[in-house]
Amino acid sequence: MVQALRLTSFSHGAGCACKLGPRELTRVLDLLGPATKPEDVLVSEETGDDAAVYRLTDGTGLVLTLDFFTPLVDDPGDWGRIAAANALSDVYAMGGSPRLALNVAGWPVDELALELLAEVLAGARQIVLEAGAAVVGGHTITTEREPLFGMVAIGFVETDAIVRNSTARPGMHLYLSKPIGTGLITTAIKRGQTDEDVARLAVDTMTSLNADASAAMVSARVGAGTDVTGFGLLGHLRKMLEASACAAIVNAGSVPLLPTVLDLARRDIVAGGTKRNHAWLQEVTEWGELTPPEQIVLADAQTSGGLLVASDQSPSTDLFTEIGEVVPGPPGSITVIGRVRE
């Protein structure tokens, strides 16, 4: 492997933490205004959902999404694998199955060897193949210093089984299929302040596909779903609740966390994107007795996070068992994190 320099030293932010903040994004979309769409557009940007869905036939929809970001780890293959899993996750979050992917890359050819880019692409292809899909092309530009990589992900979904973020209802339980904390850990990686075992666990979490959780979600006919990425757990929950005209209570002690993340938050090893999320959440969140570091963890900008699912099925059902098994961590990790209310 050709790697003379740390990839994270070329990035201003880590992974999905470099996303435009939710408040800023809302402002831009408000300035843009609504647009007329064909009637076959079943899901678009209007509810801030994870992907668009276009009806192909009476029973089949095309799922389309795009994600890209700066390096969040130093190994180029891992970066490619994480970016691919992150892009495919939006298809899974809609209840779909990925079929095709396109590479989107920006590369500082005067700063980083092309062999590194090849490793990024190879890592991404590995994950796409694992998902049963294929990489069929892409587009690459040159950049001055900061590398960028991501993918367009395309899949199919049964139109009567689309999982939206706008259909949560009071009384539904909230499930989470992965632990949180990847934003804090990748920020620590960038700053050289985390150990190898914790970094490896975070990478393993981010490269784990949401395929099994998605299949369980679809089989259970859940009420609503989304994936947890750059706006953090509570940020994506806020988007779901606003789209569904609901509220929720979250048991913070039941949220599964990756190791060391609360300590990292206490030491202020926190990405700017997470701080923007936290500020945005102040408008609507009653934190109770949670300390500022505990609040930061719940706002932490995730990359390739888990599925956040609202379902009226109780924790004793197969949905809990099947999604619970997807969560990395010790046996018995608690994945029911709260409940939707009016």
Region locations from a protein language model:
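Glycine-/charge-enriched secondary-structure boundary and capping motifs
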Residues: 2-13, 24-27, 34, 39, ...
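A generic local secondary-structure boundary/capping motif
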Residues: 41-43, 51-54, 89-93, 125, ...
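Glycine-rich anion-binding loops of enzyme active sites
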Residues: 56-73, 78-81, 97-194, 325, ...
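Small-aliphatic-rich amphipathic alpha-helix that forms the alpha element of a beta-alpha
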Residues: 76-102, 119-130, 209-221, 233-239
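N-terminal glycine-rich phosphate/pyrophosphate-binding loops that anchor nucleotide-derived ligands
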Residues: 1-93, 133, 169-174, 320-321, ...
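Acidic-glycine-rich active-site phosphate/pyrophosphate-binding loop
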Residues: 52-63, 207-213, 278-288
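Active-site glycine-rich loop that binds ribose-phosphate moieties when present
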Residues: 152-161, 197-217, 290
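Glycine- and other small-residue-rich loops at beta-strand/loop junctions that grip anionic moieties
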Residues: 17-18, 166, 177, 202, ...
